[in-house]
Design a protein with these regions (language model features):
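Ser/Thr/Pro/Gly-rich low-complexity disordered regions
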Residues: 11-108
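Short, intrinsically disordered N-terminal pre-domain segments
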Residues: 1-11
């Protein structure tokens, strides 16, 4: 909002009130053999209004195409790799991305 007179103009920016922020990070659980299913928690997020969550699984810091659910089934291509899930919390005020713990290496 800008206000002023002939000599001065004052400008303020609205604060990004209510944007999500992480209180505790997400955690992956499961066993590390091909065919097993890993599951991630959302972690704990403070957000008002409430946040919605999305997921992106990664192997060795590289995105796994199509792996965007809160569960992931390990495949042969994961052998030897470290698996992480990035959980995004989004609301009308903003978004935060938080990486989970890494699990690995994946075995056959």
């Amino acid at each position: 909002m800008g206000i002023g007179n002939a000599n001065y103009v004052y400008w303020t920016e609205a604060a990004n009130v209510g944007a999500p922020f992480t209180l505790t990070p997400p955690v992956i659980s499961g066993t590390l053999s091909v065919g097993d299913v890993l599951t991630t928690t959302n972690g704990t997020v403070s957000a008002a209004p409430a946040a919605t969550f999305s997921y992106q699984w990664m192997k060795d810091a590289t995105v796994i195409a199509g792996a965007t659910a809160n569960t992931y089934t390990l495949v042969t291509g994961n052998i030897g790799g470290m698996i992480t899930c990035v959980v995004s919390a989004t609301n009308t005020a903003g978004r935060i991305n938080t990486a989970s713990n890494s699990l690995g290496p994946v075995i056959a």
